[in-house]
Amino acid sequence: MMLFLPELALLITALVFFILTLKAPDSPKLHGVALISSVVVIITSLLCLGQTGELFYGAYGISSYSQIFKVFLGIGSLLILLTGKQFCGIKARFRAEYYIFFFLAILGLMMMVSSLDILSILVALELSSFSTYIMVALREDNPRGIHNEAAIKYLLYGVTATAFMLFGMSYLFGLTGSIQLAPLAEKLPQLMNQPIAVTSFILLLAGVFYKLALFPFHFWAPDVYEGAANETTAFAATLPKFGAIAVLIRFATLPGENSQLIINVLLGCALISMFYGNLAALVQKDVKRLLAFSGIAHGGFILLGVLVFENMGYRNAIFYTLAYVLMNIACFFVVSLISEGNKNLQVTDLTGLYKRSPLLAITFITGLFALAGIPPFIGFTGKFMLLAGALKAGHLITVILATFNTALALYYYLNLVRVTFCTDEEKEQAPIQLGVCDRATCILLIASMTLLGIFPTTILTIIESALTTL
């Protein structure tokens, strides 16, 4: 039972909220219960860090590799809840149900990082995905009804990605006679000279690419980010990346290091994601849509670490995923606090933010600088390591193009910074009052993005150690 403790805590939490939907669906204490539950999940994840073992006949593995992701997910869930401003953007009558799906989605992600066969990975992926589909639809009613459109698009794209993934799984099983990752890693490298093996492996990646919003499964991101409530967008934009990168690294060990065609496919997806995301972000007026296209580009950067096909590259990819999650949570935290009513935040709405709340402005600017890859923040450290690793692996042209994309992204990030410091004399801006918890969250996010950028050694060592148990 100790091996399954974080997942058990999440399952019990979901059951508690299910009971609360019957007894106190509108209780103001729901958010407090959720915060306490997230702290419990973090504690149970930390307690299980040194545990190893297998469950369910080898389909579920507990190791340092899986447990480090569970700690990240636990901390991330707490930050999302702090970002959520008591989830005011969610329909009041469904708020208790929202918490159920929130914790079930995290449970699915935790199951993803521990799954050791492709069928278990699919089940965990679907648990997380279907919970998130419902979360998107539970936004407070919008005159344009964009939340319903976003939920339908999210569902349709997700089902399509799952269909591709299942198709690839069926061929892999037919070729190797196994669905477990260990036998697949033994047999698949010998089959990678066959077109059907390459095709099936590429199809297998569809579900992961969907979670990372990578080309060609990125189309859902802008509409879902725009249509979902700020709290839901903050979740969908961040925590699923942990589950996706954990599974993608496991998949990357299957074909062996000499499959040049797979490397070329990953390179193509990474570069197209970067160019498409950054070019589309240049013309966005809605802040959440801008961050969606930015996320597509950052997914391409994460892929640079994976296509190196060695632990050092995997370490860099995990570190950059952690950086991306922190940077985006910081941005969405600010977006949630300054959004008025149920409206989406436009770029022009950021005008005079520094005058209204210097601390919020500094938090937002720190997140933007980190996303842009400006030193000394965590985004710079992560990008530098990814580019250095890709260059060492011989991908010179890719590194040059990725560097160009970094320069391209500077334009729209620095434009947001400019607007934040601008003031509109004709429009009276009321000061934003922050509570003690909001101030503490701002300081925590700023400190995390700065200190992990300057002193990354400790977390990199922990990730390296975890990768030895992959």
From Swiss-Prot:
EC number: 7.1.1.-
One GO term describing the cellular component: plasma membrane
Enzyme class: translocase
Biological process according to GO: ATP synthesis coupled electron transport
Any one GO molecular function term: quinone binding
Annotated transmembrane regions: 2-22, 30-50, 62-82, 99-119, 155-175, 201-221, 234-254, 261-281, 290-310, 318-338, 360-380, 395-417, 443-463
Entry keywords, A to Z: Cell inner membrane, Cell membrane, Membrane, NAD, Quinone, Translocase, Transmembrane, Transmembrane helix, Transport, Ubiquinone
Keyword flag Translocase: yes
Topology within the bilayer: Multi-pass membrane protein
Compartments in which it is found: Cell inner membrane
InterPro entries: NADH-Q_OxRdtase_suN/2, ND/Mrp_TM
Pfam families noted in UniProt: Proton_antipo_M (PF00361)
Reaction(s) the record says it catalyses: a quinone + NADH + 5 H(+)(in) = a quinol + NAD(+) + 4 H(+)(out)
Keyword Transport carried by entry: yes
First-listed, main subcellular location of the protein, grouped into a coarse class: membrane
Function: NDH-1 shuttles electrons from NADH, via FMN and iron-sulfur (Fe-S) centers, to quinones in the respiratory chain. The immediate electron acceptor for the enzyme in this species is believed to be ubiquinone. Couples the redox reaction to proton translocation (for every two electrons transferred, four hydrogen ions are translocated across the cytoplasmic membrane), and thus conserves the redox energy in a proton gradient.
PANTHER family per the UniProt record, alphabetical: NADH DEHYDROGENASE
Entry similarity comment: Belongs to the complex I subunit 2 family.
This protein's name: NADH-quinone oxidoreductase subunit N
Gene that this sequence comes from: nuoN
